[in-house]
């Protein structure tokens, strides 16, 4: 079979104007960016405000493995198959970060014959939204350091006289706002800035990947431009010498940051290999951020289609949990059905059984042992009151015997049902049965519920997430986290939801624990306020907000030929 980029390149895309017209957009509601993509205005949602929302389907997965489970393939394949079945369907996915593209994971356009095209345009830059987030974020970092420099140089009283501004009295040891870049760069995790007499007080800083920026979360959670502006104004950038928060509004930089991001608030419209519409907007990671595409994209798609299919990053303990307790809490747009993606390889890898057998070879012992992980994820999603369809993403090496055993095993669970998907190799035709089942699931009664209420304490929310969300026996807080919990409660941030940053490779905090971890303590090492996004991030165990490149990164395979064709992009 050809590579993803070869399949993408050999396909002739429809003009994006035709995709927009078929979707129901008026000419003044979108702005083409070349021939393959377009920015879409929120005015379409206002025009169709009285139209009933589409049924929303959320795609999640079992605990991820290095082999890839195929969530995006399933999301795109389902969209293609739904449309083939005569149901007007639109996909909504995140914009890929160049960190994974040039690192280990690769791009996020789907794959095979279930992908968004042109895949190189999606995976590299798109319409520049991530760069806008980076620029706005780093403007705030520059602004806080400049203010610190001038107040320190002149003293508070002289500064106020010369600038006409009130001194903020920034505590250089409590500057919370780091810098960002859209690459994996471990050497920038911890740095010191301000060296030299004319460069400001020396203080610690560091870089996160742009996908972990609070601005990326704000972009994904904002309802409109006004909401974006207000959320940016609420960003807490530092503490003053009295321990009180200093916001972007107080620093006077919130307006300029919003201006940089003004165009980024519009989702980008592209198409699948079948010519189906797909919105791409925002790109927060699911392990260190909330891991879902934007509310705005969902809102627009909901008025134009009969079914909207979106995906949440990593397993259901990660992206789906945050989709439910953060995104839906904000949007009020609850799912009518869910899809849990699984592969035979994923279950074998999650079995916890060491074996010399090739993971692609039949191994009923490991498959049966690993099934517990799938059942855990089915139960996890079911507790939110949403019908669960299991999508078995078939690989060429899978045997009929193992697939049939898995389908029968799913029948004994709380799942609505299961179907095999061959969207990767066959496109829409490979997922029509899955699409039928998912559509029927959307027509059954659902009773979506949150895992916890906003008015419960942060400590109670952490305990609920640990015990009910991950199966932990208890929660432990470091001394730093305890101090931060006290500060957050004192400053009235206790009503915010929790965004857990942890390893995605286990339901627990320890990536080496496979299957269903039990009787473990969830160690909270740090609590970070995201006042603009509207949640508190709880760092669990050893988690990094800036990834690093591996020993054989993806960029080694990427090049461009004399005709301008990109080579080796995965």
Curated annotation (Swiss-Prot):
Claim: ATP-binding is one of the keywords in the record: yes
Reactions listed under catalytic activity: (6S)-5,6,7,8-tetrahydrofolate + formate + ATP = (6R)-10-formyltetrahydrofolate + ADP + phosphate
Claim: Zinc is one of the keywords in the record: no
Entry's EC annotation: 6.3.4.3
CDD domains: FTHFS (cd00477)
Superkingdom assignment: Bacteria
One Pfam family, short name: FTHFS
Record key words, sorted: ATP-binding, Ligase, Nucleotide-binding, One-carbon metabolism
GO molecular-function term, one example from the UniProt record: ATP binding
Pathway: One-carbon metabolism; tetrahydrofolate interconversion
Residues binding ATP, per UniProt: 65-72
One BP annotation, GO: tetrahydrofolate interconversion
Family listed: Belongs to the formate--tetrahydrofolate ligase family.
NCBIfam families from the UniProt entry: PRK13505.1 (NF010030), PRK13506.1 (NF010031)
Name of the protein: Formate--tetrahydrofolate ligase
Name of the coding gene: fhs
């Amino acid at each position: 079979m050809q590579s993803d980029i070869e399949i993408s390149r050999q396909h002739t895309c429809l003009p994006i104007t035709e995709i927009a017209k078929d979707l129901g957009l008026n000419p003044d509601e979108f702005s083409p960016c070349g021939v393959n993509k377009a920015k879409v205005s929120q005015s379409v949602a206002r025009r169709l405000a009285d139209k009933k929302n589409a049924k929303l389907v959320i795609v999640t997965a079992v605990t991820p493995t290095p082999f890839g489970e195929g969530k995006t393939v399933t999301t795109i394949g389902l969209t293609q198959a739904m449309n083939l079945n005569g149901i007007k369907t639109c996909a909504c996915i995140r914009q890929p970060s160049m960190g994974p593209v040039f690192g280990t994971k690769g791009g996020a356009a789907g794959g095979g014959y279930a992908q968004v095209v042109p895949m190189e345009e999606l995976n590299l830059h798109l319409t520049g939204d991530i760069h806008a987030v980076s620029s706005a974020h780093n403007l705030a970092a520059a602004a806080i350091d400049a203010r610190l420099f001038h107040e320190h140089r002149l003293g508070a009283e002289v500064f106020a006289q010369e600038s006409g501004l009130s001194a903020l009295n920034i505590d250089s040891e409590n500057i919370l706002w780091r810098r960002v870049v859209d690459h994996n760069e471990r050497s920038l995790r911890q740095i010191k800035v301000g060296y030299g007499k004319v460069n400001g007080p020396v203080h610690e800083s560091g870089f996160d990947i742009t996908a972990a920026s609070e601005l990326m979360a704000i972009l994904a959670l904002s309802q409109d431009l006004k909401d974006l502006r207000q959320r940016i104004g609420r960003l807490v950038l530092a503490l003053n010498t009295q321990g009180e928060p200093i916001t972007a509004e107080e620093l006077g930089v919130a307006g300029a940051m919003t201006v940089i991001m003004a165009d980024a608030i519009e989702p980008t419209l592209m198409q699948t290999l079948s010519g189906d519409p797909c919105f791409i907007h925002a790109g927060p990671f699911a392990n260190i951020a909330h891991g879902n595409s934007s509310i705005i994209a969902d809102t627009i798609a909901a008025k134009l289609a009969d079914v909207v299919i979106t995906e949440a990053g990593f397993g259901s303990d990660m992206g789906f949990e945050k989709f439910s307790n953060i995104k839906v809490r904000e949007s009020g747009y609850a799912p009518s059905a869910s899809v849990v993606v699984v592969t035979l390889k994923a279950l074998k890898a999650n079995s916890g059984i060491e074996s010399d057998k090739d993971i692609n070879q039949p191994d009923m012992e490991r498959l049966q042992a690993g099934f517990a992980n799938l059942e855990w994820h089915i139960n996890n999603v079911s507790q939110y009151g949403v019908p669960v369809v299991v999508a078995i993403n078939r690989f060429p090496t899978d045997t009929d015997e193992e697939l049939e055993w898995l389908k029968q095993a799913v029948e004994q669970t709380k799942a609505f049902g299961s179907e095999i998907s061959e969207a990767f190799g066959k496109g829409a035709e490979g997922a029509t049965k899955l699409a039928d089942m998912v559509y029927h699931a959307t027509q059954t009664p659902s009773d979506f519920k949150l895992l916890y209420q906003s008015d419960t304490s942060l400590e109670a929310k952490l305990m609920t997430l640990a015990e009910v969300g991950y199966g932990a026996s208890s929660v432990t807080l470091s001394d730093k986290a305890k101090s931060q919990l006290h500060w957050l409660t004192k400053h009235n941030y206790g009503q915010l939801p929790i965004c857990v940053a942890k390893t995605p490779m286990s339901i627990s905090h320890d990536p080496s624990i496979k299957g269903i971890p039990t009787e473990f303590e969830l160690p909270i090492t740090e609590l970070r306020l995201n006042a603009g996004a509207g949640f508190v991030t709880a760092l669990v165990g050893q988690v990094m907000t800036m990834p690093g490149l591996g020993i054989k990164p993806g960029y080694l395979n990427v090049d461009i030929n004399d005709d301008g064709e990109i080579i080796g992009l995965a």
